Regions:
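Catalytic phosphate/nucleotide-handling subdomain of diverse soluble enzymes
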Residues: 133-135, 147, 156, 239-273
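Phosphate/ATP-binding catalytic cores across multiple sugar-kinase/actin-like superfamilies
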Residues: 25-33, 226-252
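Short beta-strand-loop/turn "lid" adjacent to the catalytic site in phosphate-handling enzymes
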Residues: 9-70
């Protein structure tokens, strides 16, 4: 799937096949979830599938003009016999939106606090946040946008530095064993994306494996060890998230809920705290 996201590695026949194969896996997962939850298929009204993004085209001015997600909805519908809704991102872009992040409406429905603002932070490949007003606030609107790289640069660096022996920093061990290069970190935080006002979205097209490999080379030129490089890129994710809160939060959140793979990285979580 990751190769399908990289120009020069992706092939149209692979993308075509993945579109159906991913749907088979998603259908099996949906059926397993229904069973574990104690429901029958006929009791489920619908399945919503946003698919697997392989390309999200963001222009220099921040406008999103195209996007492509895999996971064939027809396969999901056939395998589960449940009405399936898809193409959420494409519809949002067609209506003039950014196509991401998509979780903000579900966050709004399920995760508002009775009395204070709450931040819901995903740290997947890319980080995104939803700022939610409290239930007691009937006036304020939520805000959601991509904060920048989540795990993507860390994973790319670890993969490159270990020759593929590791594809992510398990338990944050490399970051915890390294030293953050504060001067380099400060320069990395000057990327124009971080200053751009929401609504905004980004992806592997900007913060991707190619950038990760280049940053490894930059770190090596600075005389940094592999652990120092990973520590600094981990700090980049943490600081870009914290800076986004300081700059753009409609109100100071009383708490943050963190999910995604980054939430299982002790080094990253410690930096965020």
């Amino acid at each position: 799937v990751l190769d399908a996201c990289i120009p020069g590695k992706s092939q149209i026949d692979t993308i075509c096949q993945l579109n159906f194969e991913l749907a088979e896996h998603f259908a099996a997962a949906a059926l397993k979830l229904i069973e574990r939850a104690g429901f029958k298929r006929g009791e489920v009204d619908l399945i919503g599938s946003h698919g697997q993004t392989v390309w999200h085209s963001v222009l220099p001015d921040g406008t999103v003009n195209a996007t492509l997600q895999l996971t064939e909805a027809a396969v999901l519908a056939e395998r589960t016999s449940i009405t399936t809704i898809s193409n959420f991102r494409a519809r949002d872009i067609a209506a003039g939106g950014q196509g991401a992040p998509l979780t903000s409406y579900l966050d709004w429905l399920l995760l508002r606090h009775p009395d204070h603002w709450r931040a819901v932070q995903n740290i997947g490949g890319i980080g995104n946040v939803t700022f939610l007003p409290p239930l007691s606030d009937a006036v304020s609107a939520p805000m959601a946008f991509d904060t920048g790289p989540g795990n993507v640069l860390i994973d790319a660096a670890v993969t490159h530095l270990t020759g593929g022996a590791q594809t992510f920093d398990r338990d944050g061990m490399m970051a915890q064993s390294g030293q953050v290069d504060a001067e380099w970190l400060e320069s990395l935080l000057q990327h124009p994306y971080y200053q751009r006002q929401p609504p905004k979205t980004t992806g592997r097209e900007l913060f991707g494996a190619e950038m990760g490999v280049q940053l490894v080379a930059d770190g090596q030129q600075r005389g940094l060890t592999p652990n120092d490089i990973v520590a600094t890129l981990t700090a980049l994710t943490a600081h870009s998230i914290a800076d986004a809160y300081r700059r753009f939060a409609p109100a100071p959140p009383g708490e943050a809920i963190v999910y995604g793979g980054g939430g299982s990285n002790p080094a990253l979580m410690q930096m965020l705290r």
